[in-house]
Regions:
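Short coil turns that delineate tetratricopeptide repeat
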Residues: 12-13, 46-47, 80-81, 133-134, ...
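Residue at a conserved register position within TPR or TPR-like alpha-solenoid repeats
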Residues: 25, 59, 93, 100, ...
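TPR alpha-solenoid repeat register
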Residues: 17, 51, 85, 137-139
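Structural register within alpha-helical repeat arrays
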Residues: 20-24, 55, 89, 96, ...
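Canonical positions in the second alpha-helix
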Residues: 6-7, 40-41, 72-75, 127-128, ...
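Short coil/linker segments at helix-helix boundaries
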Residues: 95-124
Length: 169
């Protein structure tokens, strides 16, 4: 571990150290330390797609959906064809809707806000599904929930059938 830290400090752009440090910290559920590595990397290259994507993912895993969404949307402005960035953006909107929906005493305004987040999540998650059709374990449940809440009967029926089938490796 110390070797990875030292290597990253001395050669932050060398592609060996950054992903291994991030992987180690995330596997140990030390997202705070993983974010420290990302922040250091962004000081060296603030426009790196890899570093920004990693930041978006860590923020998402920390439950910081608004911040994750901001980073994801910045990346999507530059290139909207990266599947995982679409997934992060869609999931950030989805998570915000789910969080608001936990309150059973919803006002009309709050309900509209929730539906708005589901609506915003939809294109990103559908795009991710089209780009990564075999990643059903990532897109199926969020799309199922969105289709259900937005009363998209045809799409809901399709995803319901997909979810009832066993996953293929």
């Amino acid at each position: 571990m110390q070797t990875l830290k030292e290597g990253f400090e001395h050669a932050p752009k060398f592609p060996f150290f950054f992903p291994r440090l991030i992987e180690f910290y995330t596997s140990e559920n030390r997202l705070d330390l993983a974010m420290d590595v990302v922040d250091e990397a962004l000081k060296v290259d603030a426009e790196s797609g890899l570093y920004l994507y990693t930041k978006s993912t860590i923020l998402l895993n920390q439950g910081k959906n608004k911040e994750s969404l901001e980073v994801s949307l910045k990346l999507l402005e530059r290139n909207d064809s990266v599947a995982e960035v679409n997934y992060n953006a869609g999931l950030a909107y989805f998570n915000r809707a789910v969080e608001l929906d936990k309150n059973t005493q919803l006002s009309r305004k709050r309900h509209q806000e929730i539906m708005g987040y589901y609506q915003k999540a939809l294109p990103y998650l559908e795009k991710y599904r089209n780009m990564e059709p075999k990643a059903q374990e990532k897109w199926a449940l969020p799309l199922y929930t969105i289709y259900l809440n937005l009363n998209k009967g045809k799409e809901f029926d399709e995803i319901d059938k997909i979810m009832k089938r066993p996953l293929t490796p």
